[in-house]
Design a protein with these regions (language model features):
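Charged, alpha-helix-enriched surfaces in structured cytosolic catalytic cores
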Residues: 3, 7-11, 53, 57-60, ...
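Glycine-rich phosphate-binding loops at beta-strand->alpha-helix junctions
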Residues: 21, 81-105
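Phosphate/ATP-binding catalytic cores across multiple sugar-kinase/actin-like superfamilies
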Residues: 57-84, 130-133
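Active-site lining segments that contact anionic ligands and/or coordinate catalytic metals
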Residues: 29, 44, 86-87, 110
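Residue-level signature of catalytic and energy-coupling elements of molecular machines
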Residues: 16, 69, 91, 127
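Conserved phosphate-binding/catalytic loops in two-lobed NTP-binding clefts
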Residues: 103-128, 137, 141-143
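Phosphate-binding glycine-rich/basic clefts of nucleotide- and phosphate-handling proteins
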Residues: 1-59
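Acidic, glycine/GT-rich loop-and beta-edge segments that sit at the periphery of enzyme/chaperone cores
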Residues: 6-9, 13-14, 129-143
Length: 143
């Protein structure tokens, strides 16, 4: 929107993020044709964008997540810090689906990072386990 004055819908924005969005440079550059409404001319327009442009657009959100991760790591009890150092960070949720997000976090933190087998379902399943067994939550709670 800012660079091309092109307005796209939420579904298109999500598709762009999923297809060519990344948190860290890709091995092979990707491009995508985007259709939307030109804000100044008011007419439909098609442009071609590449993954680096989307990475730039996502950079502020990615940086916010990484800063929140740093804060959480700083507040982590020593015993849990040792586990994280040994086992690493497991990405879950929709953010884990962003290409190379694991590489970016690994570079920023120096910790091993992996992606859950089913990132979307793992959030729900983990929350369910915490709700049924509060002792799990107590073991990792940050005060």
């Amino acid at each position: 929107k800012r660079k091309y004055n092109l307005l796209v819908g939420e579904r298109t924005a999500e598709q762009i993020k999923n297809e060519i969005g990344s948190a860290y440079p890709l091995d092979k550059p990707l491009t995508m044709e985007i259709k939307g409404r030109h804000l100044l001319e008011g007419i439909p327009k098609t442009i071609t964008i590449d993954d680096s442009e989307i990475r730039d657009a996502l950079s502020e959100c990615v940086a916010t997540i990484i800063n929140a991760l740093r804060v959480a790591l700083e507040r982590t009890p020593p015993e849990l810090s040792a586990d994280i150092s040994d086992r690493g960070i497991v990405l879950t949720g929709g953010g884990a689906l962003l290409k190379n997000f694991d590489k970016r976090i690994r570079e920023e933190t120096g910790l091993p990072v992996s992606i859950a087998e089913d990132p979307l379902a793992s959030v729900v399943l983990g929350t369910g386990r915490m709700l049924t067994d509060f002792s799990l939550l107590r073991r990792i709670a940050i005060e």
